[in-house]
Amino acid sequence: MELENKFKKVTLGHEEGSGAPCLKCKEKCEGFELHFWRKICRNCKCGQEEHSVLSNNEDDRKVGKLFEDTKYTALIAKLKTDGIPTYKRNVMILTSPVAAKKDVSINTVTYEWAPPVQNQALARRYMELIPKDKQPVAGSEGAQYRKKQLAKQLPAHDQDPSKCHELSPNEVKQMEQFVKKYKNEVLGVGDVKLPKEVEAQASGAGRSTNGSLSTLTTVKSTDDKVAAQKGSTYYCFRCKENMREGDPAVYAERAGYDKLWHPSCFVCFTCNELLVDMIYFWKNGKLYCGRHYCDSEKPRCAGCDELIFSNEYTQAEGLNWHLKHFCCFDCDIVLAGEIYVMVNDKAVCKPCYVKNHAVSCQGCHNAIDPEVQRVSYNGFHWHAAPECFICSCCSKCLIGQKFMPIEGMVFCSVECKKKMSS
């Protein structure tokens, strides 16, 4: 029975989102079909985040799992039906009257996520301070951006061994220890407050811990004219620009009360993207998203996108791979000891390269083998052979000679060109 249940779980995982359209390829993709171990669509090779696969419920369960057994349990609730922790995502609905010809209608704007603060005006101002195309208004480009970042920054397979492919018992144990460690030591959620409120909070924290008063990040010169004009003496830890009076700031408890960020500056040190839902990982004085924090701690397989907990793995093309996952991107044959070609940063075996990616020779019209020398000019290609790279008129070999290219044809002289034109 247990084996049967495990099998069902795997099957359902691959059925989830099946047939969902690709937002990138549009009608070129037949619909989402999850590759057995890669985190991509088998039809178009795009990632899950490029398809309309994950629902808000699935995202909420993933984030809920992340916050389980942390100091952020107030942000989750466990469903009575299955006991799975679910993220209590704060949704903000703003209404405003719109004057019409006869009567007044109500305009409603729903944010799929907003900072969990009691002061809605503060949350609204926070949204105004991040780029418009990243504001998670329901049905907008910003809402889609948030979904993509949830998938990219917080992959489920970075926290849940059951989402990984064929881990050994020892690898599962190592992963569980790794996840427990980052939950206890580096995981955090940003908080939106006015700097003066943070200062008051810092004062209380400073006195309660060691009797000394923590100081907020302030401008170095007390008579700074710019600061005086803007009415604030607080500056952003990232950009060093001044905070405007009355604007909210983001702070990270792991970083300490002496550091504040503009809402648009609360970004990952590596990818420079807004930290989705202000979820951060603090390491060596820098903010990271979940993905790039994990990348700084463990090698990541370029094939399955999972962290590598095995002592044995391979390195190729500057990337790390599980031994069983260094495979052809097209046919999945293992490439160890085989000839392969890199196509758009993906390793492809020689047969697949010749079949799917090789350019054709303008002379013989056959595919050009990747190990064979070629001549390329302006998007046209020839075998570097005396029977292929020849004058289109007199068949003179042009290897090492001057030539005149005309729409895929090459000529040895003006005379030959004129003969072909007449």
UniProtKB/Swiss-Prot annotation:
Gene: tes
Function: Scaffold protein that may play a role in cell adhesion, cell spreading and in the reorganization of the actin cytoskeleton. May inhibit cell growth. Regulates cranial neural crest migration. Acts together with prickle1 to control axial elongation.
Compositional bias annotation for Basic and acidic residues: 155-165
Tissue specificity field: Expressed in the animal hemisphere at the 4-cell stage. By stage 18, expressed in cells adjacent to the anterior neural plate. In late neurula, expressed in the cranial neural crest. At tail bud stages, expressed strongly in the head, ventral to the developing eye, branchial arches and lateral line placodes. Also localized in the otic vesicle, dorsal fin and notochord with weaker expression at intersomitic junctions of tail bud embryos.
Domain PET: start-end pairs: 92-199
Domain annotation LIM zinc-binding: ranges: 234-299, 300-359, 360-422
Keywords: Cell junction, Cytoplasm, Developmental protein, LIM domain, Metal-binding, Repeat, Zinc
Subcellular location: Cytoplasm, Cell cortex; Cell junction, Focal adhesion
Region (Disordered): 135-165
Family from the record: Belongs to the prickle / espinas / testin family.
Source organism: Xenopus laevis
Protein's name in the database: Testin
GO biological process: neural crest cell migration
Domain of life (superkingdom): Eukaryota
Alphabetical list of Pfam families matching this protein: LIM, PET
Domain-level remarks: The N-terminal and the C-terminal halves of the protein can associate with each other, thereby hindering interactions with other proteins.
GO cellular-component term (any): cytoplasm
UniProt keyword annotation of Zinc present: yes
Family annotation (PROSITE patterns): LIM_DOMAIN_1 (PS00478), LIM_DOMAIN_2 (PS50023), PET (PS51303)
GO MF terms held by the record: zinc ion binding
